[in-house]
Every structure is written in structure tokens, then in C-alpha cells.
């Protein structure tokens, strides 16, 4: 039978982490993946008594993993492999935790995830962490802060560290941040966490977007890719009759927006975790706002725009911010009415009306 690895090859550093992890005994395992969780499924195939939870923060790769295993993994394996997308790993204690990190990943997110993995371990449980830098020192230093003894496993394409949890952490760092910003003399508080866009401060692009928006009473707004919720919080604060639907594919972004709404005592924000669009009623919004990311050859921007078009009423307005207006100049005029693009400090604002 064709192996899961040949159907979709996992990352080398992830393979190395599982090679080391397979030398330890465990019935309950927590892992992350940069792929589809193929290594976890393969491990279960040869260890049918084990239960593995594979944690995703972002819903897009989570859906990819679910689709992959629905097609390629047996029912017996799927019954012991739990894929889930959430802001934090489940509270259940495990004997083994496996984490793959990237050399150029977000340092604070890596520290946060390492700490969370240690917290989920039983006393005597092991953490296995890998990195794609064979000259790594940073991850080694982080591991030594968490464990009294760290074992180094060296490979040609990766370094893997393993360590045994001997005690609960004496000091638990709080990586969550509260920051404040003003909108029309109103002080607003936002909450952010590692892994959320523009952690610890309001994004300058979001600031340009907020300043450009003028809404009236009872306006229905959808904020696509809400991040920490700064735009949603600002608009909801202006008028209690405004309804804001904030959607993002990142579980932590949705959590932060909810925390921000609670912090500002706002009851007119509804959140949705969704990387595929929105489940909100089609054609029910007056305004769609977005601050699309620049990577993925504008595929995400196109997805945001298509989501906006489905959500807006005929005549509803799209308003987004970008540093790269050329693509929008080419893409929007054939699909939207009254397209207008103008500079705003280091950014450009893009507007259009749904046909």
C-alpha cells in the first residue's frame, strides 16, 4: 500500500522530529505540523493504541489536513488522530509533545508554543523540538531555559532537541499584550497574541483604513481578515447601532477580537473563525473592509474581495488598504463599479461598489 509519505511528503525537519519521538513510549501525544500531519498518521499506523492531537492555529492548513486525511487515511487511524484548530492546545495532559519550528519563524510565537507544550506535558513527559538550522543556538537556549537537561540529536538537515519534564514551570510568561489607540478622541483597547497580525501595536495600514471610514447609524459592516480586531473595535465604538461581523482564519485573531470587544464593553461585534469565506447571510452588509496580506500572489486578496462581494448588498461598498495598488487597478474595474484608488501616506486606499 502506498505510504502517506509518498502521497504528500512531509517536511524534513518534521520527519527528524518524529524519528526522535518514535524512540520514546507514549499513549497520548500532542503535535503541530507544517504539513498535513502525515507523520502523526504514520505513527498511529504502527502504534494503534496511541492517541494524537494535532494542533493548528490557522484554519487554512487545518482544512487542508482534514481533507487530506479524509481521502488518504483509514477510519481506524482517523479515530485516534484528532485534528483541531484553536487558539491554544487542548488542556489534556500528554506524555509526549512534538514541535517543529522554522529558523525564520516568529520568535515570540515560538517561545509561546514551547511554553504551552511544556505545560501540557505530564511530569516525566518529553518535549521533542526540531529546527531547520543545523547551526542552531537559539532553540537550544530556549530549551535550556525550560528544562534542566536537553539532549541534542544532530542530522544533516536538521537539529532535534529532546528533554524530560521534571517539574511544573515556576515562572509562566504571559505573551498576551494589551495596547491602546485612539479613534476620534475615543481611547480603544485591543488585545493581541503571538501569531496574530501586528502583535503589540496597531498596524499603520489599519490606521489608514480606520481614518478613511465614515459610517452612519445602523450600518452593517463585515471586517474580512480582522486580525486583532482594531478596525472592528473602532467602528463598533463609534455607534452602538453599528453591527460589525469580524471574520478571520486565525483562531488567535478571533480570540483577540473577542477579548477586545469585552475589554471595551462592546456588544455589537460578532466574530467568526473561517478561512473559506463567511457563513454570514449573503447580501446583508453595507460595508466590507479589509487589509489583505501581500503574500501568495494576491490569491488571499482575491479571496477577500470575493468574500466581500458575496456579503455585500447591491450598492454596498468595499474599502481596503494596500501598499501595492497596481494589482487592484487591473483586477477590480471589470468586477466592481465606481472603483477609486488614492494614496494615504505610505499606503493606498481602494474602494469599489458592488454591482
Region spans (language model):
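Short beta->alpha hinge that forms the Motif I/post-I loop of the SAM-binding pocket
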Residues: 57, 109, 248-253, 300, ...
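Class I S-adenosyl-L-methionine
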Residues: 141, 145-186, 196, 324-330, ...
Amino acid at each position: 500500500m502506498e505510504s502517506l509519505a509518498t502521497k504528500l511528503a512531509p517536511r524534513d525537519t518534521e520527519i527528524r522530529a518524529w524519528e526522535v519521538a518514535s524512540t520514546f513510549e507514549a499513549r497520548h501525544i500532542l503535535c503541530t505540523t507544517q504539513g498535513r500531519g502525515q507523520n502523526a498518521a504514520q505513527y498511529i499506523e504502527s502504534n494503534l493504541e496511541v492517541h494524537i492531537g494535532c494542533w493548528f492555529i490557522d484554519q487554512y492548513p487545518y482544512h487542508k489536513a482534514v481533507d487530506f486525511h479524509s481521502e488518504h487515511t483509514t477510519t481506524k487511524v482517523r479515530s485516534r488522530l484528532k485534528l483541531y484548530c484553536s487558539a491554544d492546545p487542548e488542556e489534556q495532559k500528554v506524555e509526549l509533545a512534538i514541535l517543529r519550528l522554522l529558523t525564520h519563524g516568529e520568535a515570540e510565537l515560538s517561545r509561546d508554543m514551547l511554553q504551552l507544550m511544556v505545560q501540557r506535558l505530564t511530569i516525566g513527559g518529553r518535549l521533542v523540538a526540531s529546527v531547520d538550522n543545523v547551526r542552531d543556538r537559539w532553540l537550544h537556549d530556549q530549551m535550556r531555559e525550560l528544562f534542566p537537561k536537553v539532549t541534542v540529536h544532530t542530522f544533516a538537515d536538521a537539529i532535534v532537541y529532546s528533554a524530560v519534564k521534571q517539574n511544573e514551570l515556576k515562572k509562566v510568561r504571559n505573551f498576551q499584550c494589551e495596547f491602546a489607540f485612539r479613534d476620534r478622541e475615543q481611547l480603544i483597547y485591543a488585545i493581541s497574541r503571538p501569531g496574530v497580525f501586528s502583535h503589540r501595536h496597531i498596524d499603520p495600514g489599519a490606521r489608514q483604513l480606520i481614518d478613511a471610514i465614515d459610517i452612519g447609524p445602523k450600518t452593517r459592516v463585515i471586517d474580512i481578515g480582522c486580525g486583532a480586531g482594531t478596525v472592528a473595535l473602532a467602528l463598533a465604538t463609534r455607534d452602538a447601532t453599528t453591527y460589525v461581523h469580524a471574520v478571520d482564519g486565525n483562531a488567535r485573531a478571533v480570540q483577540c477580537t473577542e477579548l477586545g470587544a469585552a475589554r471595551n464593553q462592546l456588544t455589537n461585534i460578532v466574530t467568526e473563525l473561517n478561512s473559506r469565506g463567511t457563513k454570514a447571510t449573503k447580501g446583508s452588509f453595507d460595508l466590507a473592509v479589509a487589509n489583505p496580506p501581500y503574500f501568495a500572489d494576491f490569491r488571499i486578496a482575491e479571496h477577500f474581495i470575493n468574500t466581500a462581494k458575496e456579503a455585500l448588498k447591491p450598492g454596498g461598498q468595499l474599502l481596503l488598504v494596500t501598499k501595492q495598488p497596481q494589482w487592484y487597478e487591473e483586477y477590480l474595474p471589470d468586477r466592481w463599479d465606481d472603483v477609486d484608488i488614492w494614496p494615504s501616506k505610505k499606503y493606498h486606499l481602494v474602494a469599489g461598489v458592488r454591482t
